[in-house]
Amino acid sequence: MKLFAYFLSFLLLISGCSKNDNTNQPLPDTMYFPPLSGNEWETVSVADLSWNQNAVQPLKDFLIQKNTMAFMILVNGRIVMEEYFNGHTPSAGWEWNSAGKTLVATTTGIAQQEGLLSINDKASDFLGTGWTNMSLAKENLITVRNLLTMTSGIDDANQLVIKPNLTYVADAGTRWAYGNVFQKLTDVVSVAGNTDFETYFNEKLKNKTGMDGYWNFGTIFTIYHSTARSMARFGILALNKGKWNNEQIVDEQFFTESINTSQNINPSYGYL
């Protein structure tokens, strides 16, 4: 998976970037938030950080070998490295793939803090009775939280999220399985906010962080597309626990919950 290659590349760079004992340059310890529009973005160099400059080219070679499209490293919001490969450009979009689930979770958290829903609400409060192919008793066990934590108990064998495929395997909360039924959260937010999901997402998250991009609501996958810089913007939001500049865009408690164990079946999983 490409996202794994990006992450592995980042780890390799960090492990290869040693400090120079003869240089004592101060780190840019103040957090920087790029302007919401335009291409202005502060940078800091590898040399300024006293990182290992000799490791940069081997890293680039590795990224090319792994068919990487875009690669960025930020320190406190400032760009240290920004590289594009294999014909990709700064203005070109790319799929977030599974990382887009984090955007869905964050948007759900914003809807909760605005009082539009509680993640403890039944999913059927928003999706209506009969949104699954399960008995009513079993369907009513599924909460918004279950969709966030992959514990709906719905059969994950078929990734096409249509009613005939949403069949019972286990009671909600008793089984963890990675699947596409999380996509129903976009419908939950849409109903709760009385608008379509993308409009709500744009207003509450995308525009407030200066991201670009769009959602592709396909028959199997719901995928966000954007530039690498937009993904970096979301990274800055995450680094600051849901805060952008002086605005708490997503509740810090929800953000903390989302990156910690959310249930006792798969302790490695938070919210999407």
Protein language model features and the residues they cover:
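Active-site SXXK
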Residues: 77, 94-120, 147, 184-189, ...
